[in-house]
Amino acid sequence: MANEMKKAAPFGMKDKVGYMFGDFGNDFTFLLSSSFLMKFYTDVMGVNAAIVGMVMMIARFVDAFTDVGMGQIVDHSKPTKDGKFRPWIKRMCGPVAIASFLIYQSGLAGMPYGFKVAWLFITYILWGSIFYTSINIPYGSMASAVSADPKDRAELSTWRTIGSTLANMVIGVATPMVAYVVVDGKTVMSGSRMTIIAGVFSICAILCYIVCFKLTRERVEVPASSQKVSASAIFKSIFTNRALLGIIVAAIFVLLSQLTVMSLAGYVYPNVYGSAAAQSTASLLGTVVMLIVCAPFASKLAAKFGKKELAVASSICSALVWLVCLIWRPASVWGFVACYILANIGMGFFNTIIWAMITDVIDDAEVRSGIREDGTIYSVYSFARKLGQAFSSGLVGTLLGIIGYTEATAFDPAVTRGIFNMACIAPIIGFVCIVLALVFLYPLNKKKVEENVAALAARRNSK
Protein backbone atom coordinates (compact mmCIF):
# COMPACT_ATOMS: atom_id res chain seq x y z
CA MET A 1 0.00 0.00 0.00
CA ALA A 2 2.80 2.41 0.93
CA ASN A 3 4.58 1.68 -2.36
CA GLU A 4 1.41 2.37 -4.33
CA MET A 5 1.06 5.71 -2.55
CA LYS A 6 4.63 6.65 -3.38
CA LYS A 7 3.92 5.93 -7.06
CA ALA A 8 0.84 8.18 -7.07
CA ALA A 9 1.16 11.35 -9.13
CA PRO A 10 1.69 14.57 -7.16
CA PHE A 11 -1.38 16.36 -5.84
CA GLY A 12 -2.96 18.36 -8.63
CA MET A 13 -6.02 19.44 -10.54
CA LYS A 14 -7.32 15.88 -11.03
CA ASP A 15 -7.63 15.48 -7.27
CA LYS A 16 -9.41 18.82 -6.90
CA VAL A 17 -11.90 18.10 -9.66
CA GLY A 18 -12.44 14.55 -8.44
CA TYR A 19 -13.05 15.70 -4.88
CA MET A 20 -15.43 18.35 -6.18
CA PHE A 21 -17.51 15.68 -7.93
CA GLY A 22 -17.74 13.77 -4.65
CA ASP A 23 -19.71 16.54 -2.98
CA PHE A 24 -21.60 17.15 -6.22
CA GLY A 25 -22.81 13.57 -5.84
CA ASN A 26 -23.54 13.99 -2.13
CA ASP A 27 -25.68 17.04 -2.70
CA PHE A 28 -27.78 15.60 -5.49
CA THR A 29 -29.55 13.70 -2.71
CA PHE A 30 -28.76 15.86 0.33
CA LEU A 31 -29.87 19.22 -1.10
CA LEU A 32 -32.95 17.66 -2.68
CA SER A 33 -33.93 16.46 0.78
CA SER A 34 -33.04 19.73 2.48
CA SER A 35 -34.91 21.91 0.00
CA PHE A 36 -37.92 19.92 -1.17
CA LEU A 37 -38.66 16.90 1.05
CA MET A 38 -40.75 18.88 3.55
CA LYS A 39 -42.71 20.54 0.73
CA PHE A 40 -43.23 17.19 -1.02
CA TYR A 41 -44.63 15.46 2.04
CA THR A 42 -46.84 18.35 3.20
CA ASP A 43 -48.27 19.35 -0.17
CA VAL A 44 -48.16 16.14 -2.24
CA MET A 45 -48.39 13.33 0.31
CA GLY A 46 -50.68 15.29 2.64
CA VAL A 47 -48.70 14.65 5.84
CA ASN A 48 -48.87 17.27 8.61
CA ALA A 49 -45.77 19.51 8.68
CA ALA A 50 -45.15 18.91 12.39
CA ILE A 51 -45.20 15.14 11.85
CA VAL A 52 -42.79 15.39 8.90
CA GLY A 53 -40.43 17.50 10.98
CA MET A 54 -40.64 15.09 13.91
CA VAL A 55 -39.96 12.05 11.72
CA MET A 56 -36.94 13.76 10.18
CA MET A 57 -35.66 14.79 13.61
CA ILE A 58 -35.99 11.27 15.03
CA ALA A 59 -34.21 9.85 11.99
CA ARG A 60 -31.31 12.20 12.47
CA PHE A 61 -30.87 11.19 16.10
CA VAL A 62 -30.46 7.60 14.91
CA ASP A 63 -27.25 8.92 13.38
CA ALA A 64 -25.77 9.16 16.88
CA PHE A 65 -25.09 5.46 16.44
CA THR A 66 -24.60 5.06 12.70
CA ASP A 67 -22.22 8.02 12.23
CA VAL A 68 -19.94 7.08 15.10
CA GLY A 69 -20.13 3.42 14.13
CA MET A 70 -19.13 4.21 10.56
CA GLY A 71 -16.25 6.36 11.77
CA GLN A 72 -14.96 3.42 13.81
CA ILE A 73 -15.36 1.04 10.86
CA VAL A 74 -13.35 3.39 8.65
CA ASP A 75 -10.61 3.91 11.25
CA HIS A 76 -10.26 0.15 11.80
CA SER A 77 -10.31 -0.78 8.10
CA LYS A 78 -7.05 -1.71 6.40
CA PRO A 79 -5.82 0.23 3.36
CA THR A 80 -6.31 -1.50 0.00
CA LYS A 81 -4.74 -0.86 -3.39
CA ASP A 82 -7.37 1.85 -3.89
CA GLY A 83 -6.64 3.44 -0.52
CA LYS A 84 -8.45 3.36 2.79
CA PHE A 85 -11.34 5.72 2.04
CA ARG A 86 -11.95 5.66 -1.73
CA PRO A 87 -13.33 2.08 -1.87
CA TRP A 88 -16.34 3.11 0.21
CA ILE A 89 -17.36 5.61 -2.45
CA LYS A 90 -17.50 2.87 -5.08
CA ARG A 91 -19.31 0.43 -2.79
CA MET A 92 -22.06 2.70 -1.52
CA CYS A 93 -22.88 5.04 -4.44
CA GLY A 94 -25.66 2.77 -5.73
CA PRO A 95 -27.47 2.14 -2.42
CA VAL A 96 -27.52 5.82 -1.40
CA ALA A 97 -28.95 6.87 -4.77
CA ILE A 98 -31.67 4.19 -4.76
CA ALA A 99 -32.71 5.00 -1.19
CA SER A 100 -33.03 8.68 -2.06
CA PHE A 101 -35.27 7.91 -5.04
CA LEU A 102 -37.56 5.74 -2.90
CA ILE A 103 -38.36 8.68 -0.61
CA TYR A 104 -40.19 10.62 -3.35
CA GLN A 105 -42.83 8.14 -4.51
CA SER A 106 -45.89 10.24 -5.36
CA GLY A 107 -47.77 7.11 -6.44
CA LEU A 108 -48.20 6.32 -2.74
CA ALA A 109 -50.08 9.56 -2.01
CA GLY A 110 -53.39 7.69 -1.90
CA MET A 111 -52.20 5.15 0.67
CA PRO A 112 -53.38 5.28 4.32
CA TYR A 113 -51.91 8.10 6.43
CA GLY A 114 -49.98 5.75 8.74
CA PHE A 115 -48.42 3.98 5.77
CA LYS A 116 -47.15 7.28 4.34
CA VAL A 117 -45.59 8.30 7.65
CA ALA A 118 -43.96 4.86 7.99
CA TRP A 119 -42.70 5.02 4.38
CA LEU A 120 -41.11 8.41 5.05
CA PHE A 121 -39.48 7.17 8.24
CA ILE A 122 -38.08 3.93 6.78
CA THR A 123 -36.79 5.36 3.50
CA TYR A 124 -35.36 8.44 5.21
CA ILE A 125 -33.49 6.24 7.73
CA LEU A 126 -32.14 4.03 4.93
CA TRP A 127 -30.97 7.02 2.93
CA GLY A 128 -29.59 9.32 5.62
CA SER A 129 -28.65 7.19 8.60
CA ILE A 130 -27.22 4.19 6.77
CA PHE A 131 -26.23 4.71 3.14
CA TYR A 132 -25.44 8.45 3.12
CA THR A 133 -23.43 8.00 6.31
CA SER A 134 -21.48 5.09 4.82
CA ILE A 135 -20.33 7.18 1.86
CA ASN A 136 -20.09 10.67 3.34
CA ILE A 137 -17.84 9.87 6.31
CA PRO A 138 -15.16 8.09 4.24
CA TYR A 139 -15.42 10.85 1.63
CA GLY A 140 -14.86 13.60 4.19
CA SER A 141 -12.08 11.69 5.95
CA MET A 142 -10.33 11.12 2.63
CA ALA A 143 -9.19 14.76 2.40
CA SER A 144 -6.43 14.22 4.96
CA ALA A 145 -5.16 11.20 2.98
CA VAL A 146 -5.11 12.95 -0.40
CA SER A 147 -2.43 15.37 0.85
CA ALA A 148 -0.64 16.22 4.09
CA ASP A 149 -0.15 19.85 3.05
CA PRO A 150 -2.65 22.20 4.78
CA LYS A 151 -2.71 24.42 1.69
CA ASP A 152 -3.72 21.46 -0.48
CA ARG A 153 -6.41 20.55 2.03
CA ALA A 154 -7.71 24.12 1.97
CA GLU A 155 -7.94 23.84 -1.81
CA LEU A 156 -9.82 20.55 -1.48
CA SER A 157 -12.21 22.31 0.88
CA THR A 158 -12.71 25.05 -1.69
CA TRP A 159 -13.31 22.58 -4.51
CA ARG A 160 -15.67 20.59 -2.32
CA THR A 161 -17.69 23.75 -1.83
CA ILE A 162 -17.63 24.39 -5.58
CA GLY A 163 -19.14 20.93 -6.08
CA SER A 164 -21.81 21.66 -3.50
CA THR A 165 -22.48 25.03 -5.12
CA LEU A 166 -22.85 23.52 -8.59
CA ALA A 167 -25.25 20.92 -7.22
CA ASN A 168 -27.18 23.69 -5.51
CA MET A 169 -27.43 25.50 -8.84
CA VAL A 170 -28.70 22.44 -10.70
CA ILE A 171 -31.16 21.44 -7.98
CA GLY A 172 -32.16 24.95 -6.95
CA VAL A 173 -32.68 26.20 -10.50
CA ALA A 174 -34.06 23.14 -12.28
CA THR A 175 -36.33 21.71 -9.60
CA PRO A 176 -38.66 24.72 -9.12
CA MET A 177 -38.92 25.20 -12.89
CA VAL A 178 -39.97 21.58 -13.44
CA ALA A 179 -41.70 20.58 -10.19
CA TYR A 180 -44.15 23.48 -9.83
CA VAL A 181 -47.29 23.99 -11.90
CA VAL A 182 -50.01 26.64 -11.77
CA VAL A 183 -53.45 25.36 -10.74
CA ASP A 184 -56.35 27.81 -10.41
CA GLY A 185 -53.90 30.69 -10.35
CA LYS A 186 -51.82 29.21 -7.50
CA THR A 187 -48.31 27.77 -7.73
CA VAL A 188 -48.32 24.17 -6.45
CA MET A 189 -45.93 21.19 -6.54
CA SER A 190 -46.53 18.30 -8.95
CA GLY A 191 -45.93 14.95 -7.24
CA SER A 192 -45.29 12.95 -10.41
CA ARG A 193 -42.73 15.47 -11.59
CA MET A 194 -40.93 15.33 -8.25
CA THR A 195 -40.65 11.54 -8.52
CA ILE A 196 -39.05 11.86 -11.96
CA ILE A 197 -36.70 14.59 -10.70
CA ALA A 198 -35.60 12.38 -7.79
CA GLY A 199 -34.83 9.53 -10.19
CA VAL A 200 -32.78 11.73 -12.51
CA PHE A 201 -30.81 13.22 -9.63
CA SER A 202 -30.09 9.75 -8.21
CA ILE A 203 -28.54 8.71 -11.53
CA CYS A 204 -26.51 11.93 -11.59
CA ALA A 205 -25.28 11.21 -8.05
CA ILE A 206 -23.94 7.79 -9.06
CA LEU A 207 -22.09 9.27 -12.04
CA CYS A 208 -20.51 11.96 -9.86
CA TYR A 209 -19.33 9.42 -7.28
CA ILE A 210 -17.72 7.33 -10.02
CA VAL A 211 -15.83 10.38 -11.31
CA CYS A 212 -14.67 11.14 -7.75
CA PHE A 213 -13.37 7.60 -7.32
CA LYS A 214 -11.56 7.63 -10.67
CA LEU A 215 -9.82 11.00 -10.34
CA THR A 216 -8.69 11.14 -6.70
CA ARG A 217 -5.68 9.40 -5.15
CA GLU A 218 -4.67 8.81 -1.53
CA ARG A 219 -1.03 9.73 -0.81
CA VAL A 220 -0.85 9.77 2.99
CA GLU A 221 -0.96 6.28 4.45
CA VAL A 222 -3.42 6.07 7.33
CA PRO A 223 -2.90 2.66 9.00
CA ALA A 224 -5.78 0.72 10.50
CA SER A 225 -6.44 1.73 14.09
CA SER A 226 -6.33 -1.10 16.62
CA GLN A 227 -7.84 1.04 19.34
CA LYS A 228 -11.46 0.37 20.24
CA VAL A 229 -13.35 3.46 21.30
CA SER A 230 -16.84 3.34 22.74
CA ALA A 231 -19.51 5.82 21.74
CA SER A 232 -19.56 7.19 25.29
CA ALA A 233 -15.80 7.75 25.19
CA ILE A 234 -16.08 9.54 21.88
CA PHE A 235 -18.76 11.92 23.08
CA LYS A 236 -16.87 12.45 26.32
CA SER A 237 -13.88 13.55 24.25
CA ILE A 238 -15.99 16.30 22.71
CA PHE A 239 -16.12 18.11 26.01
CA THR A 240 -12.37 17.78 26.59
CA ASN A 241 -11.48 19.07 23.12
CA ARG A 242 -12.36 22.75 22.77
CA ALA A 243 -11.63 22.82 19.06
CA LEU A 244 -13.95 19.90 18.35
CA LEU A 245 -16.65 21.28 20.65
CA GLY A 246 -16.42 24.72 19.07
CA ILE A 247 -16.67 23.48 15.50
CA ILE A 248 -19.51 21.12 16.44
CA VAL A 249 -21.59 23.92 17.98
CA ALA A 250 -20.84 26.16 14.99
CA ALA A 251 -21.74 23.35 12.57
CA ILE A 252 -25.09 22.77 14.24
CA PHE A 253 -26.03 26.41 13.82
CA VAL A 254 -24.61 26.62 10.29
CA LEU A 255 -26.92 23.80 9.25
CA LEU A 256 -29.79 25.22 11.29
CA SER A 257 -29.47 28.54 9.46
CA GLN A 258 -28.72 27.23 5.99
CA LEU A 259 -31.23 24.42 5.87
CA THR A 260 -34.04 26.43 7.44
CA VAL A 261 -33.60 29.05 4.72
CA MET A 262 -33.47 26.33 2.06
CA SER A 263 -36.53 24.50 3.40
CA LEU A 264 -38.56 27.67 3.74
CA ALA A 265 -37.61 28.78 0.23
CA GLY A 266 -40.13 26.21 -0.98
CA TYR A 267 -42.78 28.15 0.94
CA VAL A 268 -41.54 31.76 0.68
CA TYR A 269 -41.36 31.98 -3.10
CA PRO A 270 -44.54 30.13 -4.18
CA ASN A 271 -46.71 30.99 -1.16
CA VAL A 272 -45.57 34.46 -0.02
CA TYR A 273 -44.58 35.89 -3.40
CA GLY A 274 -46.34 33.53 -5.83
CA SER A 275 -43.21 33.03 -7.92
CA ALA A 276 -41.48 29.67 -8.27
CA ALA A 277 -39.41 31.24 -11.06
CA ALA A 278 -37.87 33.65 -8.53
CA GLN A 279 -36.69 30.65 -6.50
CA SER A 280 -34.84 29.34 -9.55
CA THR A 281 -33.36 32.78 -10.23
CA ALA A 282 -32.24 33.18 -6.61
CA SER A 283 -30.52 29.79 -6.69
CA LEU A 284 -28.80 30.62 -9.98
CA LEU A 285 -27.61 34.06 -8.87
CA GLY A 286 -26.55 32.70 -5.49
CA THR A 287 -24.45 30.06 -7.23
CA VAL A 288 -22.86 32.56 -9.61
CA VAL A 289 -21.96 34.88 -6.74
CA MET A 290 -20.57 31.93 -4.79
CA LEU A 291 -18.36 30.85 -7.68
CA ILE A 292 -17.19 34.36 -8.55
CA VAL A 293 -16.76 35.86 -5.07
CA CYS A 294 -16.41 33.12 -2.45
CA ALA A 295 -14.62 30.21 -4.12
CA PRO A 296 -11.71 32.19 -5.66
CA PHE A 297 -10.96 34.30 -2.59
CA ALA A 298 -11.84 32.13 0.42
CA SER A 299 -8.53 30.23 0.52
CA LYS A 300 -6.52 33.42 0.00
CA LEU A 301 -8.39 35.32 2.71
CA ALA A 302 -8.10 32.35 5.07
CA ALA A 303 -4.36 32.11 4.42
CA LYS A 304 -3.92 35.82 5.13
CA PHE A 305 -6.26 36.35 8.09
CA GLY A 306 -6.99 32.81 9.34
CA LYS A 307 -9.93 30.46 8.86
CA LYS A 308 -11.52 31.23 12.23
CA GLU A 309 -11.19 34.95 11.68
CA LEU A 310 -12.81 34.76 8.22
CA ALA A 311 -15.65 32.56 9.50
CA VAL A 312 -16.51 35.02 12.29
CA ALA A 313 -16.53 38.04 9.96
CA SER A 314 -18.65 36.32 7.31
CA SER A 315 -21.20 35.11 9.87
CA ILE A 316 -21.64 38.62 11.28
CA CYS A 317 -22.29 39.95 7.77
CA SER A 318 -24.94 37.30 7.06
CA ALA A 319 -26.76 38.01 10.34
CA LEU A 320 -26.88 41.73 9.57
CA VAL A 321 -28.30 41.15 6.08
CA TRP A 322 -31.18 39.01 7.39
CA LEU A 323 -31.89 41.59 10.10
CA VAL A 324 -32.22 44.28 7.42
CA CYS A 325 -34.54 41.99 5.43
CA LEU A 326 -36.76 41.40 8.47
CA ILE A 327 -37.07 45.14 9.18
CA TRP A 328 -37.48 46.09 5.51
CA ARG A 329 -40.01 43.38 4.62
CA PRO A 330 -39.64 43.87 0.83
CA ALA A 331 -42.93 43.90 -1.05
CA SER A 332 -41.20 42.74 -4.22
CA VAL A 333 -39.80 39.23 -4.47
CA TRP A 334 -36.62 40.68 -5.99
CA GLY A 335 -35.90 42.60 -2.79
CA PHE A 336 -35.98 39.30 -0.93
CA VAL A 337 -33.77 37.72 -3.59
CA ALA A 338 -31.23 40.54 -3.15
CA CYS A 339 -31.10 39.94 0.61
CA TYR A 340 -30.72 36.21 0.05
CA ILE A 341 -27.77 36.70 -2.30
CA LEU A 342 -25.97 39.14 0.01
CA ALA A 343 -26.44 36.82 2.99
CA ASN A 344 -25.28 33.93 0.83
CA ILE A 345 -21.93 35.64 0.29
CA GLY A 346 -21.22 35.69 4.01
CA MET A 347 -22.40 32.12 4.47
CA GLY A 348 -20.47 31.08 1.36
CA PHE A 349 -17.10 32.10 2.75
CA PHE A 350 -17.71 30.05 5.90
CA ASN A 351 -18.98 27.03 3.96
CA THR A 352 -15.94 27.17 1.69
CA ILE A 353 -13.42 26.89 4.52
CA ILE A 354 -15.28 24.83 7.11
CA TRP A 355 -14.01 21.52 5.71
CA ALA A 356 -10.43 22.75 6.02
CA MET A 357 -11.22 23.70 9.63
CA ILE A 358 -12.08 20.05 10.31
CA THR A 359 -8.60 18.96 9.23
CA ASP A 360 -7.21 21.61 11.60
CA VAL A 361 -9.23 20.00 14.41
CA ILE A 362 -7.89 16.55 13.45
CA ASP A 363 -4.32 17.91 13.47
CA ASP A 364 -4.89 19.58 16.85
CA ALA A 365 -6.16 16.32 18.36
CA GLU A 366 -3.10 14.46 17.03
CA VAL A 367 -0.74 17.07 18.47
CA ARG A 368 -2.34 16.70 21.90
CA SER A 369 -2.85 12.93 22.01
CA GLY A 370 -0.37 11.51 19.52
CA ILE A 371 -3.18 9.53 17.88
CA ARG A 372 -4.65 10.40 14.50
CA GLU A 373 -8.27 9.33 14.05
CA ASP A 374 -9.63 11.06 10.97
CA GLY A 375 -12.68 8.84 10.61
CA THR A 376 -13.76 9.05 14.24
CA ILE A 377 -13.45 12.83 14.51
CA TYR A 378 -15.08 13.34 11.15
CA SER A 379 -17.93 11.04 12.14
CA VAL A 380 -18.57 13.04 15.33
CA TYR A 381 -18.55 16.23 13.27
CA SER A 382 -20.85 14.62 10.71
CA PHE A 383 -23.23 13.69 13.51
CA ALA A 384 -23.20 17.32 14.66
CA ARG A 385 -24.15 18.40 11.15
CA LYS A 386 -27.03 15.96 11.21
CA LEU A 387 -28.12 17.39 14.54
CA GLY A 388 -28.29 20.70 12.71
CA GLN A 389 -30.39 19.01 10.03
CA ALA A 390 -32.61 17.47 12.70
CA PHE A 391 -33.14 20.73 14.54
CA SER A 392 -33.83 22.48 11.25
CA SER A 393 -36.37 19.86 10.15
CA GLY A 394 -38.01 19.84 13.54
CA LEU A 395 -38.02 23.63 13.76
CA VAL A 396 -39.48 24.18 10.29
CA GLY A 397 -42.10 21.48 10.73
CA THR A 398 -43.09 22.69 14.20
CA LEU A 399 -43.27 26.36 13.24
CA LEU A 400 -45.30 25.60 10.12
CA GLY A 401 -47.68 23.71 12.36
CA ILE A 402 -47.84 26.57 14.88
CA ILE A 403 -48.73 29.16 12.25
CA GLY A 404 -51.42 26.81 10.95
CA TYR A 405 -49.90 25.74 7.62
CA THR A 406 -51.91 23.08 5.78
CA GLU A 407 -52.84 22.50 2.15
CA ALA A 408 -56.03 24.50 2.81
CA THR A 409 -54.38 27.49 4.56
CA ALA A 410 -51.18 27.62 2.49
CA PHE A 411 -52.01 31.02 0.98
CA ASP A 412 -53.76 32.72 3.93
CA PRO A 413 -52.22 36.16 4.78
CA ALA A 414 -51.51 35.25 8.42
CA VAL A 415 -49.74 32.06 7.34
CA THR A 416 -47.63 33.77 4.67
CA ARG A 417 -46.57 36.47 7.17
CA GLY A 418 -45.47 33.75 9.54
CA ILE A 419 -43.47 32.04 6.79
CA PHE A 420 -41.63 35.29 5.98
CA ASN A 421 -40.82 35.97 9.64
CA MET A 422 -39.43 32.44 10.10
CA ALA A 423 -37.27 32.78 6.98
CA CYS A 424 -35.53 35.85 8.45
CA ILE A 425 -35.44 35.26 12.21
CA ALA A 426 -34.06 31.69 12.08
CA PRO A 427 -30.83 32.61 10.21
CA ILE A 428 -30.33 35.73 12.37
CA ILE A 429 -30.33 33.62 15.54
CA GLY A 430 -28.24 30.92 13.87
CA PHE A 431 -25.45 33.21 12.69
CA VAL A 432 -25.25 35.03 16.03
CA CYS A 433 -24.78 31.65 17.74
CA ILE A 434 -22.08 30.71 15.21
CA VAL A 435 -20.12 33.84 16.07
CA LEU A 436 -20.42 33.15 19.81
CA ALA A 437 -19.26 29.54 19.36
CA LEU A 438 -16.23 30.47 17.29
CA VAL A 439 -15.18 33.41 19.48
CA PHE A 440 -15.59 31.75 22.88
CA LEU A 441 -15.13 28.01 22.20
CA TYR A 442 -13.02 27.44 19.07
CA PRO A 443 -9.32 28.10 19.88
CA LEU A 444 -7.68 27.41 16.50
CA ASN A 445 -6.79 30.86 15.25
CA LYS A 446 -4.22 31.41 12.52
CA LYS A 447 -1.24 31.31 14.89
CA LYS A 448 -2.32 28.09 16.61
CA VAL A 449 -2.96 26.27 13.32
CA GLU A 450 0.52 27.16 12.06
CA GLU A 451 2.06 25.91 15.32
CA ASN A 452 0.23 22.57 15.01
CA VAL A 453 1.31 22.09 11.39
CA ALA A 454 4.95 22.72 12.35
CA ALA A 455 4.74 20.33 15.31
CA LEU A 456 3.32 17.49 13.22
CA ALA A 457 5.88 18.06 10.46
CA ALA A 458 8.68 17.84 13.03
CA ARG A 459 7.30 14.56 14.41
CA ARG A 460 7.02 12.96 10.97
CA ASN A 461 10.48 14.10 9.91
CA SER A 462 11.97 12.60 13.08
CA LYS A 463 10.60 9.12 12.30
Which residues are covered by each model-predicted region?
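Membrane-embedded alpha-helical bundles of multi-pass transporters/translocases
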Residues: 2-463
